[in-house]
Amino acid sequence: MKKIYMVRHGRTYLNKYQRLQGWSDAPLTEEGIEGAHRMGKALKDQHFDLVASSDLKRAADTRKIIVSENDNWESTEMTQTADLRELFFGYYEAFHDTEGVAAAFKSTKYPRLVDAVKDGYTWQEIGDLFHAADPEGDAESGSEFESRLKRGIDYLVNHDESERILLVGHACVIHCLACIYGGKHLRTDLPKHNEMTVLNVDDNGQVSLEEFGRPMY
């Protein structure tokens, strides 16, 4: 049985400023760098056959910091894929969370995106709302987002003989994957930077959620 251990990238300046951060990128803050080092130390006694991330710089940088804390990972294979990028908010990239959500939902009911998630909005619905509201039509639809993530997980599942895989990902990505493979929408906070979520992959390639949001430090 394979397992995919998912952690979120370190905190960035766009996180700090409460901006929607999809395909737009920003450097890790000092807190984010320190958090990545702490995650690396928390994983010190773990063995992974593959360490992966999205191709966005904040995720790749976090992956490199985590690996730097583990000398015994020197021979571990590294990879990254665009299929596991964060949700693309299109025109609303880097908007303040409150402003972007108000524009997409055409309502001021939800101060933050996570409030809509906790109120029951699925990623299918959220993606579709941003896509419909985008004056340029660039934002991903919900089905595009979910299909892309499934493609990314298929890539990891079918990657050689790797049994234990560490994925450095993104908040919406990890939450969406937990909903897809957990079989229901999770009315929870988005994953924090210090938490781990685990997927199981059985011998038939079926993926399921083992645990969500376990604090690591």
Describe every region a protein language model picked out.
Residues 53-54, 147, 168-169:
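Short beta-strand scaffold positions
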Residues 35, 39, 59-62, 141, ...:
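Alpha-helical packing segments of well-folded alpha/beta enzyme cores
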Residues 27, 72-81, 185-194:
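Short hydrophobic/aromatic-enriched beta-strand-loop microsegments
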Residues 1-48, 64, 204-217:
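An N-terminal RHG(E/S)-centered segment typical of histidine phosphatases
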Residues 40-115:
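Phosphate-coordination/substrate-recognition cap region in phosphate-metabolizing enzymes
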Residues 2, 68, 87-112, 154-164, ...:
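Acidic, low-complexity terminal tails and accessory targeting/binding regions
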Residues 108-144:
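Short glycine/proline- and acidic residue-enriched helix-loop micro-motifs
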